[in-house]
């Protein structure tokens, strides 16, 4: 599963939004995305998705929310 797909999955479960650090930790702990180099998903990757998928994610009140 791609990082953005994992983020949608997690945010759909949690209706109140999540911080980038929480999203990265949840993706890694549940092994929803495995990087090719074996490193854990970083907060930077989560922010990349938020910034590059504005129709899907929004940032408000210190949390990332689903737009869909």
Regions found by a protein language model. Name each.
Residues 12-16:
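Short helix-capping/hinge SLiMs at alpha-helix to coil transitions
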Residues 1-4, 18-21, 27-68:
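Charged low-complexity interaction tracts in eukaryotic proteins
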């Amino acid at each position: 599963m791609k990082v953005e797909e994992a983020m949608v999955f997690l945010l759909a479960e949690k209706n109140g939004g999540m911080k980038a650090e929480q999203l990265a930790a949840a993706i890694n702990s549940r092994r929803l995305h495995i990087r090719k180099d074996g490193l854990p998903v970083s907060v930077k990757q989560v922010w990349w998705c938020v910034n590059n998928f504005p129709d899907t994610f929004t940032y408000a009140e210190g949390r990332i929310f689903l737009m869909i």
